[in-house]
Amino acid sequence: MLILRKSQDRGYADHGWLKSFHSFSFAGYYDPQFMGWGNLRVINEDRVAPGMGFGKHGHRNMEIISYVLSGELAHEDSMGNIKGIPPGDVQRMSAGTGVMHSEFNHAKDQTTHFLQIWIEPNVLEIAPSYEQKTIPKESKQGKLCLIASPNTKDNAVHISADANMYAGLFDQTQSDEFLLDPARKAYVHLIRGSLDVNGQTIHGGDALLVQDETLLTLSNGKEAEVLVFDLAP
C-alpha cells in the first residue's frame, strides 16, 4: 500500500527569516494522523534567510540528519565541532545523553535550503557524536545510494537507529528498483522534480507512506531528487 501525502498538505510556518514545511507534527503544527512513520519522526524542509539561523539549543536521544540542497549551513555544537555543510554533504548528529548546537546561514545574499530529519534511536543515552560525509553526485545519479545506515561497514553516516536512508537523482530513462521487507515500513520523499513510483507520479514536496510492499520501482524522473527510507515498523 502506498499512501500519497501531497506537498501542500504538509504543515507550514513562516517566521520571516525561516520558512519551514513540516512532513510530520512539529512545534506549532500538530496533526494526530501524522506523528511520524515507523521510527521516522521529523522531516522539515527549511529555508533560512541570509545572516540568520537557529541559535544554540539542545536535543537528547535523537538521530538528527541534515541534508543541504542549496547554500551552506554553518554548524557549531557542544562537542567542539565547527563545520560548514555544503550541498552534497550529509551530516549526522547523535544527540544521545544531550547536545547543544546551532545552525546559521552566514551568506550575505543566498538562502540556505535544507532538510532536517529526525529518526528515533534504538539505543538511548549513548554518548553524543558527530559525522559528516560528502556524497558525490555520480553515486546518486540514476540509482539509490545509501547515505545513512546502522551498519558501520557501509560507506554512509552511521546512525544508532533501525533505519536506512537512501538518496537518488533520476532523469529521463533512468530507473531503479528497491526491494522491501513487507514487515517493515518505507517512506519516499521527493525533494524536487517529478518521479513515478510503482507507476504513481509524485512531484516535489510529495511523499509516499509505504507498507505491505515488496518492491519500489522508480522511473520516468524529470530532474528528480528523492530520499527513500527503510524503517522499523
Question: What are the roles of these predicted feature ranges?
Answer:
Residues 1-233:
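Jelly-roll (double-stranded beta-helix
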